[in-house]
């Protein structure tokens, strides 16, 4: 598979490294060339070691991270973890590329979910499979979709760490007064719109709902829920010339033309949508679950949460970042790195981590624990997500996604800003997307 220019330094370095270290044969190996029998011995090794953890945790997440680091140090006093903040995800990814090219990588790092395929495809992340098998990790305790988001080509490269999904945040006080509930299916949306939308002088003064137009992450699940797809099943061509792959956009255009649906696009769109909701100019907004506390703390009315409505299927997509091991980390750091990854994503501290960061728990078992019960008593709004735990799915996994997703996002922008018909524009986008895909064949 041909890689794009932005990953060229990574690929060249990885290939060069493989030509040097990849000549051994005849031994079952774990990731990075360590024989499994040596890995088992390493599991018992208590020789002091220091590892770096590169991350993008915002300041608000630091209490949660500091708690985890303190607990990890208690359990593994011989492993010193140095957390290194590397900025936003895009900055972190650029620094990872440079680190791989310089052959000087951290042992553990965050990776934003949509970037994982590109890095994994270039061979820079360690395959966690041998460690998972050795330590009998209960993979069934994770959400299926959350795990799938950090797997690529049938290998598990990471675990979900700071996980969000898009949900509908709604004005429960308003909807209760109107005697309506958030739509659970597309078939219920028209009736919901009629009862909630308010117009004055031909202009909408209160929208029924809002969907962000500034990020494809928000409308990708609408594509799949409508029975469509972004790419064909073999991922070799765009699918926006198929009727089922156009339904989402055609419905968006219809609901916008009727004045019931609002979409934000461009600079300041997220803040504007949030303010519209708080000012009761829109009854329901699709937003990341990571900002739920912001709505709860600022709304002067009761806030509810609903899973996004479905049609042919019903799913929402994973957001946030996972935690991975770098394949070319020094051999003496790999066991410590695995212990850290396993600890950070274990069920034992999952609720404390979620509370400290504002992101979602990732284990099914914690829901029924005492900590879990207290968590859902405090934040009952999250129950809508956990009622659909296995319907939280990975977004489309393709190394070219960051590039070709911009093409159909531009179509949405024209629909919002220029009132353009999205159907011919999406059909025209097929050729452009296919040109991008050609670089990955």
How would you label these PLM feature ranges?
Residues 38, 46-58, 79-84, 107-108, ...:
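Short, well-ordered beta-strand elements
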Residues 1-51, 74, 424-427, 431-441:
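Short, low-complexity disordered leader/linker segments with a strong preference
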Residues 70-75, 80, 177-178, 250, ...:
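Extracytoplasmic/periplasmic substrate-recognition and gating elements
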Residues 192-195, 235-266:
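Glycine-centered hinge/linker elements that transmit conformational signals in sensory
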Residues 70-142, 149, 173-184, 276, ...:
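Extracytoplasmic "Venus flytrap"/periplasmic binding protein-like
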Residues 37-43, 58-80, 407-408, 426:
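Short, polar/charged alpha-helical segment
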Residues 145-149, 303-306, 355-414, 439-440:
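Long, aromatic- and glycine/proline-rich binding clefts that accommodate carbohydrate-like moieties
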Residues 37-39, 43-44, 113-166, 190-193, ...:
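Hinge/lid segment of periplasmic solute-binding proteins
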């Amino acid at each position: 598979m041909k890689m794009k220019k932005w990953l060229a330094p990574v690929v060249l370095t990885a290939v060069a490294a493989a030509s040097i270290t990849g000549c051994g044969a005849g031994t079952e190996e774990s990731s990075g060339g360590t024989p499994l029998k040596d890995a088992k011995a390493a599991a018992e090794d208590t020789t002091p070691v220091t590892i770096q953890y590169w991350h993008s945790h915002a300041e608000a997440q630091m209490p949660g991270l500091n708690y985890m680091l303190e607990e990890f140090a208690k359990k593994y006093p011989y492993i010193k973890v140095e957390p290194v903040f590397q900025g936003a995800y895009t900055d972190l990814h650029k620094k990872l590329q440079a680190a791989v090219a310089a052959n000087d990588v951290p042992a553990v790092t965050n990776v934003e979910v949509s970037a994982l395929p590109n890095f994994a495809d270039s061979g820079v992340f360690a395959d966690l499979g041998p460690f998972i098998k050795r330590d009998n990790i209960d993979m069934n305790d994770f959400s299926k979709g959350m795990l799938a988001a950090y797997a690529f080509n049938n290998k598990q490269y990471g675990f979900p760490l700071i996980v969000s999904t898009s949900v509908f945040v709604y004005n429960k006080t308003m909807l209760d007064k109107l005697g309506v509930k958030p739509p659970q299916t597309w078939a219920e949306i028209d009736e919901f719109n009629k009862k909630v939308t308010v117009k004055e002088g031909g202009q909408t003064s209160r929208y029924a709902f809002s969907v962000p137009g500034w990020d494809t992450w928000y409308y990708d699940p609408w594509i799949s829920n409508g029975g469509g797809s972004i790419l064909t099943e073999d991922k070799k061509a765009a699918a926006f010339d198929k009727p089922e792959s156009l339904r989402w956009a055609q419905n968006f255009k219809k609901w916008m033309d009727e004045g019931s649906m609002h979409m934000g696009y461009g600079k300041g769109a997220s803040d504007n949508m949030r303010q519209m909701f708080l000012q009761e100019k829109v009854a329901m907004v699709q937003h990341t679950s990571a900002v739920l506390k912001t709505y709860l703390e600022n709304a002067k009315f009761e806030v509810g949460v609903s899973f996004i409505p479905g049609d042919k299927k019903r799913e929402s997509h994973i957001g946030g970042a996972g935690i991975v091991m770098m394949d070319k980390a020094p051999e003496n750091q790999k066991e410590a790195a695995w212990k850290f990854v396993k600890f950070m994503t274990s069920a034992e501290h999952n609720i404390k981590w979620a509370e400290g960061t504002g992101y979602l728990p990732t284990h099914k078992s914690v829901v029924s624990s005492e900590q879990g019960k207290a968590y859902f008593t405090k934040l009952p709004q999250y129950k809508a997500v956990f009622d659909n735990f296995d319907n939280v799915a990975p977004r489309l996994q393709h190394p070219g996604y960051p590039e070709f997703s911009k093409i159909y996002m531009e179509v949405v922008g024209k629909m919002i800003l220029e009132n353009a018909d999205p159907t011919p524009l999406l059909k025209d986008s097929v050729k452009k997307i296919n040109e991008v895909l050609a670089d990955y064949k």
